[in-house]
A protein has these predicted regions:
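A glycine-rich (often HGG/GG-containing) alpha/beta subdomain
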Residues: 1-101
Length: 101
């Protein structure tokens, strides 16, 4: 099972971080960006889209941490997005559509 959560804390902020950990982490990033996984540990700017409509959700920074050399020991990704509630909820909704997340 792949898990995801807001790791930057609740409330209004300029930037929010969604952390994803587990075997489907790479699938999540590929599905949201329609691009390959970025170079490990290198911040990469990407457009983050609705999986079904390709509508832009936000433009954010993706960080990829392959396991076992990650914070959790599993494949892991961080998505740094704008901190508004609508953006956060939209991204969490899209991730939840992916099998095993």
């Amino acid at each position: 099972m792949t898990i995801f959560a807001l790791s930057s804390g609740p409330g209004v902020s300029g930037v929010a971080i969604i952390r994803i950990s587990g075997p489907e982490s790479s699938k999540v990033i590929k599905s949201l960006t329609s691009k390959e996984i970025p170079v490990p540990r290198m911040a990469t700017l990407r457009k983050i889209n609705n999986i079904n409509t390709s509508e832009l959700i936000d433009e954010g920074i993706i960080l990829w941490f392959p396991g076992p050399e990650s914070y959790t020991g599993e494949d892991m990704a961080e998505i740094h997005i704008h901190g508004g509630k609508a953006v956060i909820l939209s991204l969490q909704n899209e991730i939840s559509k992916i099998d095993n997340c």
